């Protein structure tokens, strides 16, 4: 069956996968390339799986122009695993065992809290009353003795995105790119470590890609579990323990799809078009739809908004979500910590998908506006 599905999935992750990728997975599920077995059954030590993992790594390197002095590794544990792995691997780079954190939303806050288990954490700006903007980097209080500076490129819950790489005065920069990885080009050479869970823009849940500069390997704290130690995993070619084989395979297929559709630059162009369609409706709704994020820091990936007023009319929001569901549009409910509505526009979400939502939003506005 290759007929398009009726459901439009705006899920925040796990998220929509390209239809052609799903068909490829379906085609190869029982018999991978004539081997008579599924990737689900394949030994991670086999030459056939080595081809899969090498292909996925090579595509990451090609699509992001990853310099040769960086390792690309595939790990388990998701973004939360990396909240621990980053300090365990890097906070010991300097004797003071401290790190700078930029906290612009729920995920960077969670990362900073986890890092406190392993050293001293310095939040480089005054605590934000609400996560609706990125504090001006020129005001950040960077600690010259910090082992690294950490930030989250896109906050999925609050819809705040960096559209720039912060200048951290030569410090080692670590970035959680889980929710905008390969949605735009990135200069990898500006970072010490980049990590991203695959389940938003580049695949299915279960695998996290980590890009780490060679000179940062080998400084893990003594208590760092081996499965989280970058040097151990890099020297083992991500095979220190049994990796998430099927998720790595799916990621390879999605990366191939991104490559065939113009790469990161084309993804950014599409993301701009898709997000602008929704933001325009919000901004022209005379306060019916309200996005709390400052316009210059709005995310192209995740658009949170309230309906009726800035605090949200919950009855109206429920009606909106129920009606969207009737129209086969799913996973639009805002995160439980903020409420409201959230539209996630990852790479596989098409312009046609967004047009369908935009049309519904306009109709809903006309029906309920005074």
Curated annotation (Swiss-Prot):
SUPFAM superfamilies per record: PLP-dependent transferases
The prosthetic group or cofactor this protein requires is: pyridoxal 5'-phosphate
Task: Give residues where N6-(pyridoxal phosphate)lysine occurs.
Answer: 200
Give the UniProt keywords, A-Z: Acetylation, Amino-acid biosynthesis, Aminotransferase, Phosphoprotein, Pyridoxal phosphate, Serine biosynthesis, Transferase
* Enzyme kind, highest EC tier: transferase
Example GO biological process? L-serine biosynthetic process
Chain's role: Involved in L-serine biosynthesis via the phosphorylated pathway, a three-step pathway converting the glycolytic intermediate 3-phospho-D-glycerate into L-serine. Catalyzes the second step, that is the pyridoxal 5'-phosphate-dependent transamination of 3-phosphohydroxypyruvate and L-glutamate to O-phosphoserine (OPS) and alpha-ketoglutarate.
Indicate where the modification N6-acetyllysine is found in the sequence: 51, 127, 269, 318, 323, 333
Name of the protein this chain belongs to: Phosphoserine aminotransferase
């Amino acid at each position: 069956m290759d007929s398009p599905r009726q459901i439009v999935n705006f899920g925040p992750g796990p998220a929509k996968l390209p239809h052609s990728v799903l068909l490829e997975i379906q085609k190869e599920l029982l018999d991978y390339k004539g081997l008579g077995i599924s990737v689900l059954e394949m030994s991670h030590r086999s030459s056939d799986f080595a081809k899969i993992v090498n292909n996925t790594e090579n595509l990451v390197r090609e699509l992001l122009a990853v310099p040769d002095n960086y390792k690309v590794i595939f790990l388990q544990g998701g973004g939360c695993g990396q909240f621990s792995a980053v300090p365990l691997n890097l906070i010991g780079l300097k004797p003071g065992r401290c790190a700078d954190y930029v906290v612009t939303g729920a995920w960077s806050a969670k990362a900073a809290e986890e890092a406190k288990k392993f050293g001293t954490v310095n939040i480089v700006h005054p605590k934000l009353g609400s996560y609706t903007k990125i504090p001006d980097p020129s005001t950040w209080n960077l600690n010259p003795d910090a082992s690294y500076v950490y930030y989250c490129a896109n906050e999925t819950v609050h819809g705040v995105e960096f559209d720039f790489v912060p200048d951290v005065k030569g410090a080692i920069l670590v970035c959680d790119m889980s929710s905008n990885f390969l949605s735009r080009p990135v200069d990898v050479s500006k970072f010490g470590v980049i990590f991203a869970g695959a389940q938003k823009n580049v695949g299915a849940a279960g695998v996290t890609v980590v890009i780490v500069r060679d000179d940062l390997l080998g400084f893990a704290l003594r208590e760092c579990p081996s499965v989280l130690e970058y040097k151990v995993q890099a020297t083992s070619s991500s095979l220190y323990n049994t990796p998430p084989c099927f998720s790595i395979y799916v990621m390879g297929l999605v990366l191939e799809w991104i490559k065939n559709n113009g790469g990161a630059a084309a993804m950014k162009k599409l993301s701009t078009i898709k997000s602008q369609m929704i933001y325009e409706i919000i901004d022209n709704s005379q306060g019916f739809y309200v996005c709390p994020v400052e316009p210059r820091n709005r995310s192209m990936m995740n658009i949170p908004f309230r309906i009726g007023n800035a605090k949200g009319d919950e009855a109206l929001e429920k009606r909106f979500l129920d009606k969207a569901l009737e129209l086969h549009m799913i996973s639009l409910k805002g995160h439980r910590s903020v409420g409201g509505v959230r539209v996630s526009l990852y790479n596989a979400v098409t312009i046609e998908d967004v047009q369908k939502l935009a049309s519904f939003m306009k109709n809903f506005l006309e029906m309920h506006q005074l």
